[in-house]
C-alpha cells in the first residue's frame, strides 16, 4: 500500500500496486502526485470525502458572504453588511478546521509549491477545458472570460514559483546585489544586500521588510 497526495487539488489517496497515472479527483498527471507517509488518518474513507465537501462548502460560503456584505453596504445597510462579514469570518475558521484535518497546511515552501501547482492546473487544464466547452455550447463571451482569467492564473503561478525559489535559496531577505529595502510597517528605507534584523525606526523584525518598488 502506497500513499499519495495531489499537489494540485490536495487529494490524499492510497493504491495497492504500481504508481498512479492521474489524480482520481482532478485528473492531473502523475508527475503532480507526491508519495507521502500515511499521515492522513481519513485517507480513502467516506469521512475524507465529507471533510473535503465541508471545506469546499465553508470556503464558498465565506466568499459569498463577503460579496453580500459589499452589496448590503452599497444599499445602505451597514449593520447587515457587518453581520455578513462577521459570519464570513466564522465560515473561514470552519473551513480551516476541516482543511487542517486533511493536513492541507504545510510550511511556507510546501504551501508555495501547492499554490503554484494549483494555479498551473487552473490555467493549463481547468479554464482551457471550460473555455472550449463554453465555445461549443455557444457561450463565446464567457469562453473569453475563462481565457482571460487563465492568463491571470499563469501570472499567479509564476509569482509563487519565484517566491518559492527565494525561500529555497534563502534569498527572501538577502540578495547578491545592493537593493533598496522598505519596512512594510513604517516605511523606513535601507540600502544594502540584506534587510536589517530590526527596523531602526519602528523596531519591527526583519520579516516586515520587502524590496522597495515604485509602480506609479
Regions found by a protein language model. Give the residues of each.
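Non-heme di-metal
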Residues: 2-216
